[in-house]
A protein has these predicted regions:
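Metal-dependent active-site segment of extracytoplasmic phospho-/sulfohydrolases and closely related
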Residues: 148, 163, 374-426, 442-452, ...
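Loop/turn elements at helix/coil->beta-strand transitions in domains of secreted/extracellular proteins
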Residues: 134-138, 170-175, 223-230, 332-338, ...
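Membrane-interface soluble catalytic domains
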Residues: 1-26, 30-45, 49, 57, ...
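Short beta-strand segments
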Residues: 142, 178, 231-233, 336-344, ...
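His/Cys-centered metal/cofactor-coordination and adjacent catalytic loops
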Residues: 130-136, 147-264
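A long, amphipathic alpha-helix that forms part
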Residues: 89-95, 103-134, 316-336, 356-399, ...
């Protein structure tokens, strides 16, 4: 009886402790859980993301609950009369004041001048521009890893793009279009910002946009014009939120986004962006694990999602992406901007619905050309579906359609890419042979809308460009990855001063000059003729050392420390070979 009475008396005390210490206990529990999860995975390969059964998930919830009870108990005891806080209240108060002082000093030291969110364009009167009655919808419908040489609209012997062939006469087709990054992350970043990846330092994950680059992008300008922005791509690698693009999209990959946020968060973001991103990233990791353990949503391995092809869940496949796009076309406020990226042609095995150039969909080897062509045919078929839907809705001639790819097959940078733009009412048609690049697309769209592209964009409007030629800079990642997609293992060796930047190439007058800037022992400068020289180019090709100097100058202008790339130093210490 006495035991029962004691237990009953303890209940109010436990409730009181819970009310008093719940918040710090939750913070400590979340921190301890993340540390334990990372530790157990590093040592034993066991972590919460692999909990696929109810029993396994319950095991983790028990651990979390025990952590929470433990911290409640320890906090209550420490705060009791004979606890640590009770005994050493004065000393602890002094210690707390010292720690607060040090924290304040840290905040002052890490303080940045508030980031500017100005976009450098005047959008107030654009909707009333005399160029057109109303702003058009804009759809970027891209596919991963497509060489233009495998598309019949570019002269390929197989009819891989029958739909695009049929609208060639009402489109503007660019014959010498180049990527700015061999990685999708950097290429999509270049597409949406009009900035070189060397400027934003966004080449491959874990790179994210930082500083004013977080706010300076095409979607932000379009939102200022009243566009509703839609991002249908891939989480982790090219999702706008995951890349820390701010004020960019209203909808991204199955979720509505709150671009306003709290004023307090915005205040800290502009002044302590690194701290805010650190808190956001850890909060996201904790949320993903808890959502997975609760069965609300499964943690999806981003690398496995890319490579699983036909095995992808419907909502994570290209079928799901096209379904999302159709739903948004029907439901989204007008005008809208949609950035869509399909993965069917990514490889090394390809995803598509119908075997056109093969007997079956069975792929016994990697990078099989016939199946690659099937995937390109599928992209063309999806493009037809969107075109027809817009036509049925009466929106076709009020929509700017851009068909493009992020990089060449197998992440190659020495292949031209498709760029096909279908303007409303067929305003611009024909074929352009002048070289163009991914960073040119954003300023081209703005020029069409009547907006002068901001100075921070590296690209040029293709609508107002003459016959001049200029160097195109292309990057690859330095990551030497050891990856097991099923076990979430990725190892990367990132070193200063170039970090995720590996090889940099310069396409100039039909020649691609390339060098691995991290090979400090013997940097290799190679050159390759990649397309015929334009008539406006000089008769004599660049000398290798001049090309080398142009690449180094570009890196220096982009803010890199190029001391170890000094041409004279290289000539003295190493050999620079031209192949």
């Amino acid at each position: 009886m006495s035991t029962l009475l004691a237990s009953m008396k303890a209940v109010p005390k436990a409730v009181s402790n819970l009310a008093r210490y719940a918040i710090p206990a939750i913070v400590l529990t979340g921190t301890a859980f993340l540390m334990l999860d990372n530790f157990s995975y590093t040592l034993f390969g066991i972590a919460s993301h692999s909990a696929s059964t109810f029993a396994f998930q319950a095991y983790y919830w028990i651990i979390i609950f025990l952590f929470f009870i433990y911290f409640i108990d320890k906090l209550a005891k420490a705060n009791s009369t004979d606890g640590v806080i009770g005994k050493y209240c004065g000393s602890l108060l002094k210690l707390m004041l010292i720690l607060l002082g040090l924290s304040s000093v840290s905040l002052v030291v890490s303080y940045n001048q508030p980031l500017s969110t100005e976009l450098g364009v005047s959008t107030a009167a654009v909707s009333a521009t005399p160029l057109r009655d109303k702003l058009p919808n804009i759809i970027f419908l891209g596919a991963d890893g497509v060489n233009s040489s495998n598309m019949s609209i570019y002269g390929y012997q197989r009819v891989t793009t029958p739909f695009m062939d049929s609208i060639a006469h009402e489109s503007l087709i660019y014959r010498n279009h180049w990527t700015n990054s061999s990685k999708t992350t950097g290429s999509i970043g270049a597409l949406l910002t009009g900035k070189y990846p060397t400027r934003t330092k966004v080449i491959f994950r874990p790179d994210t946009f930082k500083g004013e680059d977080m706010f300076q992008h095409l979607p932000g300008i379009l939102r200022g014009l009243g566009y509703y922005n839609i991002d249908i791509t891939l989480r982790h690698y090219i999702d706008s939120e995951d890349l820390k693009m701010r004020n960019a999209f209203d909808y991204a990959n199955h979720r509505q986004l709150n671009q306003q946020g709290s004023q307090l968060k915005h205040f800290f973001l502009l002044r302590w962006p690194t701290m805010v991103q650190f808190i956001e990233e850890n909060g996201l990791r904790l949320y993903q694990r808890l959502a997975h353990l609760s069965g609300y949503t499964s943690m999806v391995n981003p690398r496995k999602q890319i490579h699983q092809g036909a095995d992808a869940a419907p909502h994570l496949s290209d079928i799901g992406r096209i379904k999302q796009l159709k739903e948004q076309i029907l439901q989204a406020p007008k005008p809208f901007f949609a950035n869509v990226h399909l993965l069917g042609p990514h490889g090394s095995k390809f995803d598509y619905q119908e075997a056109i150039f093969t007997e079956t969909k069975q792929q016994d080897e990697h990078w099989m050309v016939d199946h690659y062509d099937n995937a390109i045919y599928q992209w063309d078929a999806y493009s037809r579906e969107i075109y027809q839907l817009l036509d049925e809705l009466g929106e076709l001639d009020n929509t700017l359609l851009v068909f493009s790819s992020d990089h060449g097959k197998g992440h190659s940078v020495n292949e031209t890419l498709p760029l096909i733009i279908r303007y409303p009412n067929k305003e611009h048609t024909g074929t352009i042979t002048q070289a163009s690049q991914r960073v040119d697309i954003a300023p081209t769209v703005l020029s069409y809308l009547g907006v002068t592209p901001p100075q921070w964009m590296d690209g040029h409007s293709l609508l107002s460009r003459g016959n001049d030629f200029y160097p195109i800079f292309i990057v690859t990642s330095s990551m030497q990855q050891l990856t097991n997609a099923g076990d979430w293992k990725v190892a990367a060796n990132l070193k200063p001063p170039f970090y995720s930047l590996g090889t940099i190439s310069m396409a100039y007058c039909g020649i691609l000059y390339s060098m691995d800037i991290n090979d400090i022992h013997q940097p290799l400068l190679s050159q390759q003729r990649v397309h015929p020289k334009a008539a406006t180019c000089p008769d004599v090709d660049l000398e290798p050392m001049l090309a080398y100097g142009m690449i180094v100058t570009h890196l220096k202008e982009m803010g890199y420390n190029t001391d170890q790339l000094n041409v004279e130093l290289r000539l003295r210490q190493y050999s620079v070979r031209t192949e």
